[in-house]
């Protein structure tokens, strides 16, 4: 009798994706983050669903409904902090996943890469709207600053901002639509993840060497299921440690003050995972220029396959590209730090230099390094 997992229409799809999937035998722990992102998405959807059962998207009661969740709902505090810190874990995994893709040349699988960039944008949009929902000071002012960026668009800017707000300022209409969008986007993300995996399984996984490994592939189960379970246990351990011992470590104290349109916080800043882009936005004195730089700082990922000039797929055997990759990483960490600092003397110029270096590395230096390495191959 043929095994049901190989014949049943639904089981067959799962079998080909999770059990009998031919996988390179040498992929390292950097390949764990795809499955960890799936786990993060499941955690976020489940905790978010329970939070939505008690949350009220109204300017008068939103803040107190979050307080009610933490104080009166059974384990409400745990669900709330798992959701908030789960977002941080999501972005840590996301950035490592993208970094691994850049380092090992995963962007040569163009459809998978482009859907990945689209997923990144959607996760960022979801996280931004989620940050607005508790209706604290930073929620309100963060939403005001970011939505106001649309007004930099010539001619239609002001109309567009009012259309997003649903009025002449951020109010109940804005909060309600942000809640609705924040609720539905994760399900759209889930659908896109399926497409992302579909395209990945068309070409098969890359591996650290960047060399096709069709000669020696191994089944996904049991080898990589065990490896992924270990990664999942570590992720859950870190998330629980963060949630139970330092739930507010990555948050902003200003968000424990109810939103007040008449009182501006001394330093408006987004969550830590957006600080690098925020630093790039602030480093340009012109409003439209800043918005374009902000967009380009993320959308630059779409152009990476076109900027690829190397004959070797992976950076494993390319020391010059490796050096530039690690400089890029330190530059991003510097931008993240600067994004959290006030706009004053040393930080302004540092932010501008770090922003220039960011674009210079990706658009100019890395393609040139690849060309030099191509020349060295012929020696």
Curated annotation (Swiss-Prot):
List this protein's GO terms for biological process.
mitochondrial electron transport, ubiquinol to cytochrome c
Q: Which residues bind heme b b562?
A: 83, 182
Task: Name the GO cellular-component terms.
Answer: mitochondrial inner membrane; respiratory chain complex III
Q: How is the cofactor bound?
A: Binds 2 heme b groups non-covalently.
Keyword Nucleotide-binding on entry: no
Residues given in the record as a ubiquinone binding sites: 201
Please list the cofactors this protein needs: heme b
Question: Any stretches that span the bilayer, and where are they?
Answer: 33-53, 77-98, 113-133, 178-198, 226-246, 288-308, 320-340, 347-367
| Pfam families listed in its UniProt record | Cytochrom_B_C, Cytochrome_B
UniProt entry tagged with the keyword Heme = yes
- Return the similarity comment: Belongs to the cytochrome b family.
Its biological purpose: Component of the ubiquinol-cytochrome c reductase complex (complex III or cytochrome b-c1 complex) that is part of the mitochondrial respiratory chain. The b-c1 complex mediates electron transfer from ubiquinol to cytochrome c. Contributes to the generation of a proton gradient across the mitochondrial membrane that is then used for ATP synthesis.
Name the chain's protein.
Cytochrome b
Q: What gene makes this protein?
A: MT-CYB
């Amino acid at each position: 009798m043929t095994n049901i997992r190989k014949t049943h229409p639904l089981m067959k799809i799962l079998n080909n994706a999770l059990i009998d999937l031919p996988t390179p035998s040498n992929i390292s722990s950097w390949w764990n983050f795809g499955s960890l992102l799936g786990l993060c998405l499941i955690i976020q959807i489940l905790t978010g669903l329970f939070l939505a059962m008690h949350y009220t998207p109204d300017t008068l009661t939103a803040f107190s409904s979050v307080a009610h969740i933490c104080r009166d709902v059974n384990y409400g505090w745990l669900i709330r902090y798992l959701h908030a810190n789960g977002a941080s874990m999501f972005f840590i995994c996301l950035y490592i996943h993208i970094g691994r893709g850049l380092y090992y040349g995963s962007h040569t699988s163009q459809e998978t890469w482009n859907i990945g960039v689209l997923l990144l944008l959607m996760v960022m949009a979801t996280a931004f709207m989620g940050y607005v929902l508790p209706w604290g000071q930073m929620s309100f002012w963060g939403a005001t600053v970011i939505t106001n960026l649309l007004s930099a668009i010539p001619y239609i800017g002001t109309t567009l901002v009012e259309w997003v707000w649903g009025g002449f300022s951020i109010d109940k209409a804005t909060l309600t639509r942000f809640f609705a969008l924040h609720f539905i986007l994760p399900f759209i993300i889930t659908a896109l993840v399926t497409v992302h995996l579909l395209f990945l399984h068309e070409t098969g996984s890359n591996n650290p060497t960047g060399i096709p490994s069709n000669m020696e592939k191994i089944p996904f189960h049991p080898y990589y299921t065990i490896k992924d379970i270990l990664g999942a246990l570590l992720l859950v351990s870190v998330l629980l440690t963060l949630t139970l011992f330092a739930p507010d470590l990555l948050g902003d104290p200003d968000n424990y003050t109810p939103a007040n349109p008449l009182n501006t916080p001394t330093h408006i800043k987004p969550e830590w995972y957006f600080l690098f882009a925020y630093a790039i936005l602030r480093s340009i004195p012109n409003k439209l220029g800043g918005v374009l730089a902000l967009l380009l700082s993320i959308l630059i990922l779409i152009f990476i396959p076109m900027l690829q000039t190397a004959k070797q797929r992976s950076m494993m055997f390319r020391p010059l590209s490796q050096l530039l990759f690690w400089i890029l990483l330190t530059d991003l960490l510097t931008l993240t730090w600067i994004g959290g600092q006030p706009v004053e003397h040393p930080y302004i110029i540092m932010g501008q230099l770090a922003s220039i270096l960011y674009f210079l590395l990706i658009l100019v230096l890395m393609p040139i390094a690849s060309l030099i390495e191509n020349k060295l191959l012929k020696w």
